[in-house]
């Protein structure tokens, strides 16, 4: 999404045209191949990425930090306790100040509106590294991972099991952008927000919703799940017993296509949303997903910065 000043923000998959998302994905594949071949690329030497963490994360911090360093740049980490974002200083003022110091801002936060406000007032690119509503960087890594293992994602069917959370919201947006289908199995009361489903359907995604996990898994090309309780939402979580039928185990995987993959954004609560047998099994690509956060995010950074005359 480009604002009135031509700044490219990576807000959500719904805010970036399908052609540009595909270009980012192909760039990620190419950058990964060059890295594996030992090529060194440092187009952003001297550039700085500010990383705002109001919700901490191993994968997000390390993958963005390493990614920016591999591109030749540097990072600075700012935690919520250090910044008091929106408390001792308004989000708008913080955005304006940081824009004078750094070349891009990544934010991992709670309320989606906080990230949107930061992007509204920043004069450098803002990247959504996670909010309570969406997780677009993760899903770009997931699409990359699927295509590495199984080829084009177009026309395939993903089956989601468990809580209708931020990862699912970005998954259905990806379904519209990359032309695949999503079968959603959630217990009553844990459905995804309707605005994301409505947008995905209006933009061509095939979305099926059910409370029956076996129905959702039937013939699927990939089964995806996440923790039953998201970080920071433990006090509002429903009892785990309602999610037990949605555990991804060998019996549920057997309902999918024999070549189906298993995905999880990690960290996983083994024995809850997924069994050891599945997550450590031959259909699991969870650690490829984790690695591909690095490559996808490098391509996202490049997309955000290229049109600002900052390398390639």
UniProtKB/Swiss-Prot annotation:
GO terms for biological process: arginine biosynthetic process via ornithine; arginine catabolic process to ornithine; citrulline biosynthetic process. The keyword Cytoplasm applies. It is found in: Cytoplasm. GO terms for cellular component: cytoplasm. Carbamoyl phosphate binds at residues 57-60, 84, 108, 135-138, 265-266, 293. It catalyses: carbamoyl phosphate + L-ornithine = L-citrulline + phosphate + H(+). Pathway: Amino-acid degradation; L-arginine degradation via ADI pathway; carbamoyl phosphate from L-arginine: step 2/2. SUPFAM superfamilies: Aspartate/ornithine carbamoyltransferase. Disulfide bonds: none annotated. Keywords: Arginine metabolism, Cytoplasm, Transferase. Its EC number is 2.1.3.3. L-ornithine binds at residues 166, 226, 230-231. InterPro entries: Asp/Orn_carbamoyltranf_P-bd (IPR006132), Asp/Orn_carbamoylTrfase (IPR006130), Asp/Orn_carbamoylTrfase_sf (IPR036901), Asp_carbamoyltransf_Asp/Orn-bd (IPR006131), Orn/put_carbamltrans (IPR002292), OTCase_ArgI (IPR024904). Its main location: cytoplasm. GO terms for molecular function: amino acid binding; ornithine carbamoyltransferase activity. Reversibly catalyzes the transfer of the carbamoyl group from carbamoyl phosphate (CP) to the N(epsilon) atom of ornithine (ORN) to produce L-citrulline. PANTHER family: ORNITHINE CARBAMOYLTRANSFERASE, MITOCHONDRIAL, ORNITHINE TRANSCARBAMYLASE, MITOCHONDRIAL. Belongs to the aspartate/ornithine carbamoyltransferase superfamily. OTCase family. This is Ornithine carbamoyltransferase. It comes from Brucella abortus (strain 2308). The gene is arcB.
